[in-house]
Amino acid sequence: MENIPTVGLGTWKASPGEVTDAVKLAINLGYRHFDCAYLYHNESEVGMGISEKIKEGVVKREDLFVVSKLWCTCHKKSLVKTACTNTLEALNLDYLDLYLIHWPMGFKPGEKDIPLDRNGKVIPSHTSFLDTWEAMEDLVFEGLVKNLGVSNFNHEQLERLLDKPGLRVRPITNQIECHPYLNQKKLIDFCHKRNVSVTAYRPLGGSGGGFHLMDDTVIRKIAKKHGKSPAQILIRFQIQRNLIVIPKSVTPSRIRENIQVFDFELTEKDMEELLSLDKNLRLATFPTTENHQDYPFHIEY
């Protein structure tokens, strides 16, 4: 299992016009882990940033850890390889360091990323992520992908995959939403016990759901005490829980700040206070898919 660099640059909701510069700056600042996905519709611009830095000799391809994700409309076994090669083409790369199943749910294949019925609910593809996984394993043996992982899997789904008869490639990470308002303790404990790392997306929360983690008085107090920003506290919190963290930003000052998290340590009391903020408050609920048999959030964790 390869070591995934602890802090990566998230590229979700990074507009194509901004993301190339963000990637170039991030590489200059020492980022080596880039989290991408077909669904973000900006992979070719991410790839341009990576290619320019490789061409300039700032980094070699093997110094980078590039992640992408298989979208839900491509869960049919016959569609997996094309989805992967399309991503590689967009990123202008020969291989991915890590390829994730973006969600455990398969959707009807076709033009639309999220095909909905007349009631506004997703149209499933009647595939099983266990079958999808077999096609992803083939990608490893064909040299297109070095490692596999999952995203948004609950513990039962991850267990089904880990216990699958004839499993050839183990998932190395479960990428999940994680921040102090949704600290995911039970799921993280489960993953770590089963030797699967956890990657935290939306570690800074976000403006959805009507809350701003950055304004939380406890987080601000701890930030002030350490002479750091609230974002740096939120990232450091996850690092000290042995998580991989992928904060998204296209703002130069924030891209810089988000990786300057290795020169201080939160105390045990800080960590306890941050853990006590849990409200089980999830931002990425994907409500149009609640009808799907593999919807991951109907159970506690």
Curated annotation (Swiss-Prot):
A GO molecular-function descriptor: 1,5-anhydro-D-fructose reductase activity
Domain of life, per lineage: Eukaryota
Keyword NADP tagged: yes
Gene3D superfamilies: NADP-dependent oxidoreductase domain (3.20.20.100)
InterPro entries (alphabetical): AKR (IPR020471), Aldo/ket_reductase_CS (IPR018170), NADP_OxRdtase_dom (IPR023210), NADP_OxRdtase_dom_sf (IPR036812)
Reaction catalysed by this enzyme: 1,5-anhydro-D-glucitol + NADP(+) = 1,5-anhydro-D-fructose + NADPH + H(+)
Localization (cell): Cytoplasm
Site (Lowers pKa of active site Tyr): K69
E.C. number: 1.1.1.263
Activity regulation (UniProt): Inhibited by p-chloromercuribenzoic acid and alkyliodines.
Keyword Repeat in annotation: no
Active site: Y40 (proton donor)
GO terms under cellular component: cytoplasm
Binding, NADP(+): 35, 175, 246-258
Quaternary structure and interacting proteins, as annotated: Monomer.
Family to which this protein belongs: Belongs to the aldo/keto reductase family.
Protein name: 1,5-anhydro-D-fructose reductase
Organism of provenance: Mus musculus
Gene name of the record: Akr1e2
